């Protein structure tokens, strides 16, 4: 717990709040522009339309955002060359766990606030039908779980490389692959970690080529995909932790 508190104390001047505010602003702007182009017929499916497009926005924005947060958490020790000093006070495993816990809490707060903002957007735009509270809660949980899988990967890279450009390049590539993977067959998406934002979406889309009508419908993530997400997370966590423990300081 002391190490976790130390992480928050250390990051108080790392502009984490500004980074999170920028993420929310970009998502709000993106979705605002999207909804401004929809007609009344489209808005009848407003809640499903919102969650469907949020999955796409997550696939584009969150990989780089997660990489940025992980980098901000780890770069100070690299710049100050303080790893050896820290490891005299705590084991590498505990240091790794503290940073992972910090990332989990920051992402949880960020995504809960994001869900609250978009619930407010739905109310302001007067979406038809009752508010899908359960779906929003599950969507937030899924976004957090996928983001934590990506965070485990990014933290491993940020801890291993002193130059944070390597980790950020991975984040940029993840954003590109995240949205590109939504065009892949589902079997192929499962091999793209960043593709799980779209793979585990709660809303599907059906476009009728004859009538040219788009229909959205509720769907549930497959249990096999949930299991694969947990496997990816475990791999990134265990490998990242092992490399950090063996890293020479």
Where are these regions (language model features)?
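Aromatic- and glycine-rich beta-strand/loop motifs that create alpha-glucan
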Residues: 1-24
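Helix-capping/transition residues at the boundaries of transmembrane alpha-helices
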Residues: 10, 75, 87, 158-159
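Secretory targeting signals
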Residues: 23-66, 70, 97-164, 171, ...
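Terminal transmembrane helical anchor/hairpin motif
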Residues: 34-49, 168, 176-249
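Helix-loop-helix units of permease transmembrane domains in multi-pass membrane transporters
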Residues: 71-105
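A residue-level signal for alpha-helical anchor/packing sites in multi-pass solute transporters
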Residues: 73, 82-85, 120, 156, ...
């Amino acid at each position: 717990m002391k190490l976790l508190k130390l992480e928050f104390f250390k990051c108080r001047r790392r502009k984490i709040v500004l980074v999170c505010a920028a993420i929310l602003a970009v998502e709000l702007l993106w979705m605002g522009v999207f909804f401004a182009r929809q007609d009344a017929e489209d808005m009848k499916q407003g809640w499903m339309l919102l969650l469907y497009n949020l999955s796409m926005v997550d696939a584009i924005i969150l990989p780089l955002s997660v990489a940025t947060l992980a980098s901000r958490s780890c770069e100070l020790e690299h710049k100050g060359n303080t790893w050896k000093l820290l490891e005299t006070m705590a084991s590498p495993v505990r240091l790794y766990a503290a940073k992972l816990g910090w990332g989990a809490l920051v992402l949880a707060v960020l995504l809960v606030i994001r869900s609250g903002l978009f619930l407010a957007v739905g109310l302001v735009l007067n979406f038809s039908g009752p508010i899908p509270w359960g779906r929003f809660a599950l969507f937030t949980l899924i976004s957090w779980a996928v983001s934590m899988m990506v965070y485990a990967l990014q933290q491993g890279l940020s801890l291993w490389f002193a130059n944070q450009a390597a980790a950020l390049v991975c984040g940029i590539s993840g954003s590109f692959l995240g949205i590109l993977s939504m065009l892949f067959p589902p079997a192929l998406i499962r091999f793209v970690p960043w593709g799980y934002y779209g793979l585990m979406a709660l809303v599907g889309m059906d476009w009728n080529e004859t009538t040219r009508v788009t229909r959205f419908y509720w769907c549930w993530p497959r249990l096999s995909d949930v299991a694969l997400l947990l496997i990816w997370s475990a791999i990134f966590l265990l490998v990242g932790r092992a490399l950090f423990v063996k890293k020479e300081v």
